[in-house]
């Protein structure tokens, strides 16, 4: 009987020890959309839009607030990439607990400049439009508001949520074609 109890205790101890699989680097597939969207974290950001693993090819895109070490994103292209995801020991209070590193660019597909896409211009009263030198998204992407400048100003003043539909003019310049 004592041997059985001892055996069960040893088995219990072995199974209770953590394997720390969570801390092992993982490799995942990602698809990165051809345009960035806006987001709110510890401030206002331009975010990549991504799909991971089984979600690749779906209509669902997630805002990605991290960076991918070794990846040089260029607007106007959809990227299929493979990344290594690692746990960060003792991450900063305002930082991520995950580190993403590019392992491989599997494919790159250029998207037609006429392809429309939506960007959140204002979320919960927080506007992402800056006017330091014309209309821009967070002083990073120029916006040609076309004949919609007055409507854009009015919506930014009076609505808590504003979404713009755009098309690409150049790498870092987009044209507003519709507002909601």
Residue ranges and their predicted role:
Residues 18-21:
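Bacterial signal peptide processing site
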Residues 79-88, 158-170:
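Flexible glycine-rich surface loops and low-complexity tracts that mediate binding to linear polymers
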């Amino acid at each position: 009987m004592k041997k059985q109890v001892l055996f069960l205790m040893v088995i219990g101890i072995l199974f209770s020890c953590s394997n720390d699989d969570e801390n092992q680097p993982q490799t995942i597939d990602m698809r990165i959309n051809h345009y960035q969207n806006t987001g709110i974290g510890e401030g206002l950001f331009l975010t990549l839009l991504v799909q991971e693993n089984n979600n690749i090819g779906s209509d669902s895109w997630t805002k990605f607030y991290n960076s991918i070490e070794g990846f040089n994103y260029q607007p106007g292209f959809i990227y299929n990439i493979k990344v290594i995801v690692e746990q960060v020991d003792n991450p900063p209070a305002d930082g991520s607990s995950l580190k993403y590193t590019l392992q491989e660019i599997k494919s790159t597909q250029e998207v037609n400049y006429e392809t429309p896409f939506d960007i959140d211009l204002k979320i919960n009263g927080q506007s992402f439009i800056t006017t330091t030198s014309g209309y821009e998204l967070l002083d990073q992407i120029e916006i040609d508001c076309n004949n919609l400048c007055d409507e854009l100003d009015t919506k930014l003043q009076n609505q808590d949520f504003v979404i713009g539909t755009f098309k690409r003019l150049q790498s870092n310049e987009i044209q507003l074609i519709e507002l909601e």
